[in-house]
């Protein structure tokens, strides 16, 4: 039954590239076969509950601009928000959604009341999922908004805050499992520091390691089959965040023996904040064996902060999905639109239009990436560039069968005098442009 929030808007349909209807897909066709699999199953789109339904439209210089009928901290309002959310998922045809606990339940006066409220809304969500067919991609706990977390959650100097955060994560993993969630995400927005003057780095990193081990231990204890994901971000809200980027997270996981237990949820905007391209973080995660999922939202390249805008750059999406596909595609992860409307976009239809544009952009990127893979447009030049390493002698060199002395003798006796070869960057950039 319609809530009336979206007026008379009907389910969004595919109308093709020539359509000028803003409430129609031009490129996203869920059932189109790409590399032998349905487009929907490749992309695994999810809607972010927080930015889509809880963000009030504020910024550092002004308050709320969105007037939503569910903007009250009551269970009645939470259920109305859920009604609108699941209507939205159905209109959009989004197969998945994601949430923080604080997005979906009213704030209680203590941990017990928070848990009671969460359990009640989870039961309501379960009914909604059964009625609509929408599934949970991942759940997570908000361990950064409440003032108790102003000095961190896992890394807080107060052990009571650590304990409260750990207990909250336990309830959120339970909720995720009950709803059939395929992943559980940890984002350490306050796990970092503002100044080293009051920060014991070693202690805080050790606390974070203990916290993550607790999560993994609990996952196995209850038989949760989903993937535990860490979402890297270099800063904001803290000056320096401990899960800075993919490389930093991998080093942390390796130190704590968790590199085979935890993977990464990579956000495009966070990669940019860390001084990387999105495809760099994706390629590195593949190389390290920790790729899990993505948050698909871009930043304004001039503002210098996390603006969480919908993707609209097809060449960027093509390279991103190239690395996703080259790594074998999503297993339990997917494409979560951690994107929010601009604060002047007040109409309910704007929520749909933003997601439609993002989904079309991703669909175009996916198809371009798939064609590049089919044609070996990038993989063949890459294989040719490193072909020298396939020789018998080079393989022995790589496997460590020669000592440094033996290598030096070999170079001298063979009069090895290598000459550089072109990297063909311009050619490869032109090749990519042919596909997008």
From Swiss-Prot:
Matching InterPro entries: Xyl_isomerase-like_sf, Xyl_isomerase-like_TIM-brl, Xylose_isom_bac, Xylose_isomerase
Co-factor remark: Binds 2 magnesium ions per subunit.
PROSITE patterns to which the protein is assigned, alphabetical: XYLOSE_ISOMERASE (PS51415)
Cofactor field: Mg(2+)
Molecular function terms, GO-annotated: magnesium ion binding; xylose isomerase activity
Residues reported to bind Mg(2+) 2: 267, 270, 306, 308
Residues annotated for Mg(2+) 1 binding in this entry: 231, 267, 295, 338
Reaction(s) this enzyme catalyzes, per UniProt: alpha-D-xylose = alpha-D-xylulofuranose
Active-site positions on this chain: 100, 103
Keywords: Carbohydrate metabolism, Cytoplasm, Isomerase, Magnesium, Metal-binding, Xylose metabolism
Protein's name according to its UniProt entry: Xylose isomerase
């Amino acid at each position: 039954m319609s809530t009336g929030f979206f007026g008379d808007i009907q389910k969004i349909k595919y109308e093709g590239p020539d359509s000028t209807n803003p409430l129609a897909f031009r490129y996203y066709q869920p059932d189109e076969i790409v590399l032998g699999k349905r487009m929907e199953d490749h992309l695994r789109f999810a809607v972010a509950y927080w930015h889509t339904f809880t963000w009030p439209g504020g910024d550092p210089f002004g308050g709320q601009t969105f007037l939503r009928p569910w903007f009250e901290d009551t269970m009645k309002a939470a259920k109305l928000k859920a009604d609108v959310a699941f209507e939205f998922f159905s209109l959009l045809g989004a197969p998945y959604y994601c949430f923080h606990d604080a997005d979906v339940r009213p704030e209680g006066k203590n941990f017990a009341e928070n848990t009671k409220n969460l359990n009640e809304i989870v039961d309501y969500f379960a009914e909604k999922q059964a009625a609509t067919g929408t599934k949970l991609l991942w759940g997570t706990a908000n361990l950064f908004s409440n003032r108790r977390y102003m000095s961190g959650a896992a890394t807080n100097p107060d052990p009571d805050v650590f304990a409260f955060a750990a207990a909250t994560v336990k309830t959120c993993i339970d909720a995720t499992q009950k709803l059939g969630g395929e992943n559980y995400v940890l984002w350490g927005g306050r796990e970092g520091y503002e100044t080293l003057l009051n920060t014991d780095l070693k202690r805080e990193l050790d606390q974070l390691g203990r916290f993550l081990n607790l999560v993994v231990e609990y996952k196995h204890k209850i038989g949760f089959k989903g993937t535990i994901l860490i979402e890297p971000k270099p800063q904001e809200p803290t000056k320096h965040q401990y899960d800075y980027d993919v490389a930093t997270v991998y080093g942390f996981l390796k130190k704590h023996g968790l590199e085979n237990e935890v993977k990464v949820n990579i956000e495009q905007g966070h990669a940019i904040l860390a001084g990387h391209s999105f495809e760099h973080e994706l390629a590195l995660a593949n190389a390290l064996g920790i790729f899990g999922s993505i948050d698909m939202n871009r930043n304004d390249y001039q503002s210098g902060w996390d603006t969480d805008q919908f993707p609209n750059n097809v060449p960027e999406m093509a390279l991103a999905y190239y690395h996703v596909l080259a790594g074998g595609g999503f297993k339990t992860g997917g494409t979560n639109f951690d994107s929010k409307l601009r604060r002047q976009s007040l109409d309910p239809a704007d929520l749909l239009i933003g997601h439609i544009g993002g989904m079309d952009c991703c669909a175009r990127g996916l198809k371009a990436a798939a064609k590049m893979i089919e044609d070996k447009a990038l993989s063949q030049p890459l294989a040719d560039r490193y072909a020298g390493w396939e020789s018998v002698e080079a393989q022995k060199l790589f496997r460590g069968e020669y000592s440094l002395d033996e290598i030096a003798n070999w170079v001298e006796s063979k009069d090895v005098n290598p000459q550089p070869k072109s990297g063909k960057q311009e050619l490869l950039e032109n090749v990519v442009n042919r596909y997008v």
